[in-house]
Amino acid sequence: MAIDLPPVIPPQASTAERIEQYAALHSENIVDVNIGDYTLKISGNRYLSREQLDMIMSAAQSPAQAVSALNQAYYQLGHLLVTVYFAQRENTIFAHVINGKLAAVKAPDNIYPYFSTLIGDKDLQKSEFGSKQVLANLKSDRAGLDYAVSYQVGGDPEAYTLVFTEKPKADYDSTDLDFSVNNFGNRFLGRYFGNASLKHDFKSGVEALFSYDRALTELGEVNGGDYYDGYTFRLNYPSSFGLYGLEARYIEYARDADVSLTGDVGGDAGGNSTGLCTLALICDVSEALLGLDLNGLGSGTPLFPSPDGTNTTLNLYSETKSIAFSGEQVISSDSFQRLTTSQRLEKIDSYIEVKDYGLALDEPHTSLELGVKYTKVMRLFGFGTQLTAQGLLEAGLEADAGTLGTDSREGVVATGRRTGEFLIFKPRGGLKMAVADWASVKWDVISQYSDNKQLPLQQQFFLGGGSGLSAYLPGVLVGDSGLYTKLALESNGLPFAGLNFTPVVFVEYGQAWYEDAAGSAGDVRAIADAGFSVKLELGKTFETELIAATPMYDDNLDEKSLSALEVDFFWRLKLNF
């Protein structure tokens, strides 16, 4: 850790006369406790009840143990600036508790603002220090600095100064260059992808990241894809008020889609159309994977004029641009719990264009997301456990434009029925329990619930591939609302031929549905699978992972379409420099 937690202040030797004099002026009552042949007189106590004192003293075998246990109890309860002064007169031990206040902070300029707001605190708690420590740690790590924390006390025994001593961090590396390849696929096209990312930490605490994603169409299984390029730029800074950042993304791809239409091409994409779309791996779940209504747009207008039974190839081009401002604040933090709040304001402009037709999807929208997250470390059923609970609420702020809100039909799922004026609740939770020295049980839940509105493409809930449900390609389940849960038994890491070997077995369940849809279009579609993963790591330099799963259950899904999206395994390889 870049910044140490302030150490426990050891008991301080004094004289019986001085303690008696000080206790007479600063203590309302004195507690007498018998320890063997000795009487321990405790004065100045503010934070321990008589029951707590009796419990602490009952475990002590000697006066020295009693004084040490009393001193340690205050620290364990989170009171950092409490000191026990002690002295002995024959068979009487005097113990006076000094409840200090933070009078000053001595620290280098780059971290002083993080802790200066604590000055004047008359009962400095671990959680108060910890809430400042989290952000200061982040900045110090990025700057390559460590800090040791100590105390200074002057003439006033109740006035403490926190002193931060700086030293360079050993083996500091401010830049990471990563290259990775995988076959996780993408919701819209392709199976094989490559990524290159560059991250640099500045001495000021600013972190900058640039990432490039590319579909490796040369390796096959392109799923109709021509190319896919994605660019991400991220910048953030841990100020004394919170972690604030900027993120910009740009994605473009092109693909061909072979379509055969018969009968009425003016139907909807909610399962009520008489049109027949035969795009391999796509059209049976066309709304899910392409994000648009291949059979119609708006109130049933065909995407393109086509005689009955004509085979046509659609040339699709898609572009998505987004910019987001984010913030996260630490409300409370110590060794056992942390409470944070977050905000994210995002502007997204996304469209899909069909050659010789024009825009088939145009979804500009702005959203504000507010969140709260709580993490706690505890013992549950005798096992060390970490619990996480998070709630996010996202609201669409922009009036409908483009293709949003252009379809007045009721009960169908269609591109024009989506709206940018939405409200989404995203509860999430997690549990990690150390059931053995070598293994942990993990349970994670991710969900999303829309307020009976059909959502823009970029806000939809989808599963498959790296997003969960590892027996299928990305986009096997898509909806406005949904839920995903995973239960896993995970190794804590085992040595293997100089590598760190992490095997995992798991079961997964996911469901998704479209809102405000009638009939089968609004059905809850569900999938469950079970599988394993194996990860090998060589420090930070090399990492590879294999994931394989087999289907266990499905509901309200076409078996032919589902089997077309089934995969044998996923893998990824990552190198770090």
Residue ranges and their predicted role:
Residues 63, 83, 103-241, 273, ...:
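Outer-membrane beta-barrel initiation region
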Residues 170-174, 203-207, 238-245, 332-340, ...:
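Short loop/turn motifs that connect adjacent beta-strands in outer-membrane beta-barrel proteins
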